[in-house]
Amino acid sequence: MSNTKDTSTEDRIKAAARKVFHQKGFAGTRTRDIAEEAGINHAMLNYYFRSKEKLFEIVMMETMGQFFKGVGVILNDESTSLEEKIERVVANYSDLLLEEPDLPTFMFNEVRANPEPFVANTPILQALEHSVLARQYAEAVAQGRITEPNLMHTVLNVISLVIFPFIAQPIFTALSRTDKEAYKALMLQRKTLIPQWIKAILFLPNRAE
């Protein structure tokens, strides 16, 4: 076998690994599963990536990057209001999860099993605390415009409303006999509704910008 690695093959392996890891998690995935998904033999997989652990580390880092990509720009945009930032964060994650519905279950399961790499490589709370959004939120509290002084409650509400329906999709669709297309339509409706709900909970009447 040549010592020159083909980047297209490497990318194909990573794409296959991403798909399989997202569906089965680290513990449930065999390297043979990834090789089959990539359409290569097991020896070639080992040539490009020496271990399942190494390949998983790459996939996890890329997944976290995708999950938080663009949020920093939204949180620190001086030209948008607090209300607009809420709308954009919801839209950002709704669009991502409609494309990658297995992503939240994968991330939560793997972070729960091994939280240290996530904490070390994703200082999201620190970034949030020093963001333009946090400053705008504090100003809104001081002005008496919003009802909840703790930003973390609002963050958790947004995360829960956006992400939980994707985690609960298998249960909901089975119990309600809803097909995937109908469920996707429901998620698209929520993309518009969630910011309305958050603002209705958060802002005092006639105090939203």
What is the predicted role of each segment?
Residues 2, 59-88, 133-136:
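Amphipathic alpha-helical linker/stalk segments
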